Structure formats: structure tokens, C-alpha cells
Amino acid sequence: MHQVRTPARLIRVTLVVTVLGILPARAEAPAPPLGAYNADIKESSISGISSGAFMAVQFGVSWSSIVKGVGVIAGGPYYCAQGTAIDGLLGNLGPALTATGPCMKGPPPDLEPLFKKADEWARGGDIDDPHNIANQHIYIFTGYNDSIVNPKVADAAYRFYLHYLGGHSNANIFYQSAIGAGHSQVTVNYGQPCNKNEGDFIDHCNYDQAGIILQHIYGALNSKNRGALSGKLIAFDQRELTSPESPGSYSMAETGYVYVPSSCAALQPCRVHIALHGCKQNFETVQDRYIRHAGYNEWADTNRLIILYPQTIVGNPATDPFTPLNPFGCWDWWGYTNFNYAVKAGRQITTIKAMLDRLTSGHVPILAEAADAAAPSGIVVNDVSNTGAAIAWTPAAGAQTYTVNRASGSDNSFAPIGSVSGPSFGDLGLRPATPYRYKVTATLSAGTEGPSSPVVTATTLPVPPRCDTAGSCPIP
């Protein structure tokens, strides 16, 4: 009979546990697998704040063939940090320094290498053709009190998208820089004062950012639910979606979350929006405060939208050698997981795509019915800045394109200013503190033009105050 020798280290650990009266904790039961719903993957969209914004851009560029729109809150251009496999082999810190330097504090890097890399990866099949971006609806936001990501970085994101959208005349993009927010997800009335750059990074500025993003992407929506929500916030197992690797090796949590309205749970036709938290906003750090209070669920509840909340973890190789260094729970936009981080094969992009595939795997296609040209309905002013206005409307059945007409001043004559294929329009290059009137007509594939929508008036904001010290500048 062999004598089993107990290692001395185990004896010491056992003694400590016994002396302190600590009982071994039972492992928590894993969350259930992510469910499947009747959602069309080509109606999917994504948004994020800070590192989540950089990841949203990466995902939207990598999978541009299926992503309908992208919301970029306090983020920058695609592949901004420019981390490469050579950096990884040599242990270079360059990408991390670029991420925390030019890609946050500015001035941002030259965009030409980023365009060349995106085009190179597209030719090799590592990402979708970036010219698909011309069909996406893009919302970019920088608060002038943001002391963490310089507004010049958001300017670079705007210029990156303009390159693929075809220039300033493309009305699929809207850039908001006239709100005095700090580095934050911005809400109407939840969170810290508007100019803060700390805490949970959710600031209240009387600005419904989640709703504005969703309406810029999908058109005018039903009013959000201001009462008890009908749906459920569901925890799901992220481990099966990184298998055979552990989620920790991707700096992702074992559990993610998804908000599913009752209509989507009943398998009515739905759409998916992916909402990515920023650094220091994951569940491990702020519990469910971002998930419940970012503002998406209230809009989702009345508009058949599923909101996916993937989760990162704080990573420290000193305590877990299989976890990459990620002290603030950021998404990987500089190469801390590996140097495929910005393409389809990136570990986190692959996992988020697997989540999206699962959620949309119950989709039942519906044949479109022929319809007469009708006036777009429900037209709303979705957002205004000091130099722009964003309008949205409910899609008209059978419409192939929409023509937006504008009038200003005392002149009541409307002139066409552009055509779009989707139900929203970003009108930039306007004068501050000036009213503009808009109406929209729909055109069918045969060229038949329908009647005009009702007229809405958007008044642009005044020029924001000069802000030399972000975080302390006045908010009108």
C-alpha cells in the first residue's frame, strides 16, 4: 500500500483555512447558454463608450457586411494603436503607448496608414470590404468636458468614416460635439453631473444618448418605456462561446448579459444592438449599473430590440498567468490579447460575433410585400449640435430611397439636400442657433415618388463655450 504524501504547501494552506474558519466556497452554477431569437443578423448594430467605442469600431469595420450602424462615444478611428504581431514577438510597448498617448490625448495618428491597413486586410479576407461602411449609419460623440479622450481623437474617427462614406455629403453620419459631457455614457437624468470624468462614467446631461443612437441607426422608434419594463435582463454563459479557450484568456468574464423584451421572448421579429461598456464599467467593477442605466433597455422594450451586453474582466497575470494584463477591464484595441485583435479572428471580436450568431439563429425570414409609395411618418428631430441636425422617421413600406428637403429663414421654399436609403439623415455644416425646417419623401424602386412627410423644425445649438480645462467648463 502506497503512502500518499501531502505537499507542504497544501498543508500550510489547509492550516490557514482551518485557523481562520474559512470554508471552501462552492462554485456557483454557471449561467444558462445564450438563447436564440427571431432576429435578422443584417439588422444588427453596435455601440460603445471609450474602449467599448474602439471595439465597436473594430467590430463594425470587421463585419461591415452585417452591421447596420455604429455608435462611437469617446472613441477613435479603426486600428488607431496599430499593434502588430512583430510588436508581440518583440515585446514592444509601442501600441500600448500609442493607445494611451495619441489615441487618447492626441494628436491622433495619421489616417493614411489606417486606410491602407484596412484595405490590405480586406483584400486578404481578414475583414469585410470596408466600402460596406458607406451603408452604415454612424453616430460619433465627444463631450467637450472629456478629459480622458481628447476631442481631436473623435475628430479622427469622424474623418476615418468620411473616407469610406464618400465625404461630407453622406448623410449617414452625425457628429455631436456640442454637449458638455465628461468622459461618459450620457443619459437624461441618471448618474453624475454632466461634466464628470470619474466614478461609473455615466453622466446626466438631459441628453438621451442611447435613444439618439438607436434612432439614427433604425429611424424613428416608438417612445421608450418610462415605467416597469416588460422584458428580462438575462445572465448567460460566455464560457461556451470562447471554448475550448477559457474566457479569462480573452480577458472576458464567465457571464454576460442580454436584455430581451417580452415581444422578442415570444419570437416576434426583432433586432440586436450590442452595447459595449468602457474601462472600469464592467460588471466586476460597477455591477449592473451600466447594464441597467446606460439607457438602451427602455427603448428596446417598446421597439423589439434585444440589447447584448458582453463583459470583460480585470486581468492580472501575476495572480492568473493565463489572463492577459488588463487592469481596468478595457476592451482590446491595442493588442493585449493577441495581434489579431482588430480583425475577424480577434479573440474578443470572434466571441462577440459568436454571441450575435447565437442570438440571431432563430431568424424566420419574411417576404416583403409590394406597396404604394406613401409619406414617411413619425418624423422627429433626433439630435442637434451647433453645426448640425439629425432627423429620423418611420420607414415607409416599399421605399427604396428617401429625399430630404430643407428650408431656412423666412423663405418657405424647400430644396432637396440629399437622398438616403435608410430612415435617418445627418445634416452637417449648418449655422449655430438657427432654425431649419425639414420634410421627407419616399421613392419606390420604379421611381414613383410619394407625398411628403409633415414638416419638422430643428434649431441648432449655440456655439459651445471655449473649454481650456476639460471637466470644469460651463454647461449652458
List where the protein language model places each region.
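Pro/Thr/Ser/Gly-rich low-complexity, intrinsically disordered linker/stalk tracts
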Residues: 369-398, 432, 447-467
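Extracellular low-complexity, O-glycosylation-prone stalks/linkers
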Residues: 398-416, 439
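Primarily recognizes the serine-hydrolase "nucleophile elbow" in alpha/beta-hydrolase
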Residues: 40-91, 122-124, 222
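Cap/lid segment of the alpha/beta-hydrolase catalytic domain
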Residues: 32-34, 81-100, 188-199, 281-290, ...
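N-terminal cap/lid segment of alpha/beta-hydrolase-fold proteins
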Residues: 103-121, 220-267
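Short beta-strand element of the alpha/beta-hydrolase
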Residues: 268-278
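The feature captures the conserved acid-bearing segment of alpha/beta-hydrolase catalytic domains
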Residues: 80-164, 168-173, 213, 260, ...
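Beta-strand-rich modules
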Residues: 427-446
